[in-house]
Amino acid sequence: MLAFTHEFPHDLPPAMSRGHCILSHGFESGPDATKVTALADVAQRLGWSHERPDYTDLDARHEISRVGDVPARLQRLVERAAEMATRGPLVLAGSSLGAYISAITSLQVPVAGLFLMVPPTTMGPMPALDAAAVPISVVHAWNDELIPAADVIAWAAERKARLLLVNDGHRLMRHVDASCQAFEALLRGL
């Protein structure tokens, strides 16, 4: 299943947008999830084209791992990002598992920036979280029940990434607006 929710700014054809954002949802979420939808609205308003790939078919593959087929998820993003990077500036953004694959993809595909929400610093047998040396903005929750804040703080510090820590849990449900503001700051800074 290769489904994408893809939009270009209404008043700009794709070739005239500021760039393109690929917004990757978290595990057992979807392309219409609250956070990636809110980020799409920010990108649209700022003149960036955007898309939200659907990884739900891969997340459902529990026979591969408890978080589905992560290598196939990563490959799907790498292939799409490589295609879009040939057209102009590319920003990858994601939540949780979507943040992980966005960061790892940046090591293989040229990107202008990364926006990572509650990124896991480890992913079982997959490589530890790493990212290209590009502008990185991270939003993480002090009370994340899955990913210790201390691990993300250390990871962000090593890369001198912009880091916003909020009083919330892994889903960042009380900080969607704060996440959008941080994403807007990243896009405006590029």
Locations of regions flagged by a protein language model:
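Short beta-strand/loop motif that positions the catalytic acidic residue
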Residues: 132, 136-140, 144
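Short beta-strand immediately N-terminal to the catalytic nucleophile in serine-hydrolase-like folds
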Residues: 92-94, 117
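Post-His helix in hydrolase/transferase enzymes
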Residues: 173-188
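A conserved short beta-strand
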Residues: 110-122
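Conserved alpha/beta-hydrolase "acid-adjacent" motif
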Residues: 32, 145-151
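Serine-hydrolase catalytic machinery in alpha/beta-hydrolase-like enzymes
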Residues: 2-89, 101-104
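Catalytic histidine neighborhood in serine/cysteine hydrolases
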Residues: 49-51, 156-172
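Active-site loop->helix "elbow" adjoining a glycine-rich segment at hydrolase catalytic centers
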Residues: 95-99
